[in-house]
Amino acid sequence: MINKIDVSLLRSIMLGIWQFMIHLKQRITEDQINMRAGHLAYVTLLSLVPMVAVTMSMLSAFPVFKGIRSHIETFIYENFIPSAGDSVQMYINEFVANASKGTAVGIGALVVVAILLISNIDKSLNGIWRTTEKRPMVVSFSMYWMVLTLGPVLMGASLVATSYVVSLKLFSGTDLSGVVPLLVERLPMFFSVATFLLIYMVVPNTKVKFFHALLGAIVAALLFELGKKGFALYLTEFPAYEAIYGALATIPILFMWVYLSWIIVLIGAEITAAMPEYLDKRLMDLVNKELADDESEIHLDEHKR
């Protein structure tokens, strides 16, 4: 009896997952996330240098982050841009150095372009959530500015805290001595989950449940880690782009990776947005089934009378 219940429960869970995957596929097709990702990748490449310039300017404004700029750059390029990180870092740093020599008007233009990227992310994600109500202009600008200013500071603070924990000798000689290096090794994964969770909770102009956002963030982070390893493997085993483009190979490689990254971000957003829709649909199906069963019982009783 117990085995039959277990098999029935497992079958019901698997059927539910399969139905959710069908619903998710339909949603992804309707939203054309490949086109959205292409648009965001294009805007990201235009905004990449301004975003990095603004980020580094914010970090340099705080003395506590003065000595860790190079560590932050290395951490980002090694963990979030696979294989071609060194060449990308060299070019972007050169572009940022040139941009920082500009006038106040030029630097202001960089900030505007950086805000343009955040605005496009906002519109794309709210399109996935089917939200028609727009935020007031003041609220939107405040949110974009908060991302530009607080984002780099929080990232720097996280890395400083991690470096401090690693430098402590609190766990040396204990059973936990091997835990800290393991946590540090998983740090990019934790950052990815936290970043995706923040995006899926804050950006949509609608209420998003924490569990739904967490599920989407975990799936997106796992896909991101797999994507990094797969993309790095492709570049090392099949170096066709370097053979064709030579010194310019960094450009299409970077575009491909940014495009793939946005596909992953949007898939996580689709999962987060699809969860409440699917659960509501399941609930309605159960209610309708119960009503149908009640009606059939009533008709049966009337027939017996």
Swiss-Prot record:
Domain of life: Bacteria
InterPro entries, per database record: UPF0761_bac, Virul_fac_BrkB
Membrane topology, from the record: Multi-pass membrane protein
Entry GO CC: plasma membrane
Name of the protein in question: UPF0761 membrane protein Shew_3545
UniProt-listed Pfam families: Virul_fac_BrkB
Keywords on record: Cell inner membrane, Cell membrane, Membrane, Transmembrane, Transmembrane helix
Transmembrane segments annotated in the record for this chain: 45-65, 102-122, 137-157, 179-199, 213-233, 247-267
UniProt-annotated location(s): Cell inner membrane
NCBIfam families associated with the record: PRK01637.1, yihY_not_rbn
Source species of the chain: Shewanella loihica (strain ATCC BAA-1088 / PV-4)
Family: Belongs to the UPF0761 family.
